[in-house]
Structures are given as structure tokens and as C-alpha cells.
Design a protein with these regions (language model features):
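A positively charged, amphipathic N-terminal helix/segment that binds anionic biomolecules
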Residues: 1-118
Length: 118
């Protein structure tokens, strides 16, 4: 399946509308952070919360208060949502760029897999 058949049904207004919705969603995102948090249950000194992430290939863990745990938990969820939103925005961008702008001569037609549209 080549580009001609991939993009015959490119609906520019529909794609632009979805892109605008995704952009608006990004504007509403709160705090973000990578890593993960865990509630390790009660320990000798009370509840134990932990934030773990990779820094320069090394695992780094930090003890948290309950309020820090809750805030970081939300920030990490926001980070994952941002990543998914950006991924979709990239796909839509490539769909428009390769579907509406002229291509150079090619020996083979580009497929969805090559363009990351699957």
C-alpha cells in the first residue's frame, strides 16, 4: 500500500481539528514528572512513600511525605498523558506533511510503518 492509497482520504479540516484539540489538552496539563511512586505500606516509623526514577542510567529513589506522594502521583499521570498526546500529534503531523506536500522521486512507495502511522 503506497502513499497514494494511504492519503486518498486525508481530511485536512478533521486532522487539524483533532490536532487543535490535542494542543488544547496540553495547555491544561498540570505539573509533570517522570519516574514512578509507590506506597510501601507502614514501616517502623509510619507510612513509607517513595519516588524512583533513572538519572544518567542509575536508579535514584527519594523518600516522600504523603502529600508529596499524592502530588507526584498526579504529576506522573500527567507526564504519561503528555507523552501519549505528543505521540498522536506527531502522527497527525506526519500524516499532513506526507499527505499534502510534494514528495521527491522514490524507488519504493512509503508505507504506514515507515512513516510511523500504524
Amino acid at each position: 500500500m503506497g502513499l497514494d492509497s494511504l492519503f486518498m482520504n486525508v481530511n485536512l479540516p478533521q486532522i487539524q481539528a483533532e490536532y487543535d484539540r490535542l494542543r488544547a489538552r496540553l495547555a491544561k496539563v498540570g505539573w509533570i514528572s517522570h519516574g514512578y511512586v509507590q506506597d510501601r505500606g507502614p514501616g517502623a516509623g509510619g507510612p513509607c512513600y517513595q519516588w524512583t526514577r533513572k538519572v544518567k542510567g542509575k536508579t535514584v529513589s527519594v523518600a516522600l511525605s504523603e502529600k508529596q506522594y499524592e502530588a507526584l502521583k498526579q504529576a506522573i499521570e500527567n507526564w504519561r498523558e503528555v507523552q501519549q498526546t505528543l505521540q498522536r500529534m506527531q502522527e497527525l503531523s506526519r500524516e499532513i506533511i506526507f499527505g499534502t506536500l510534494p514528495n521527491p522521486p522514490r524507488r519504493k512507495r512509503l508505507g504506514k510503518k515507515v512513516l510511523g502511522l500504524n
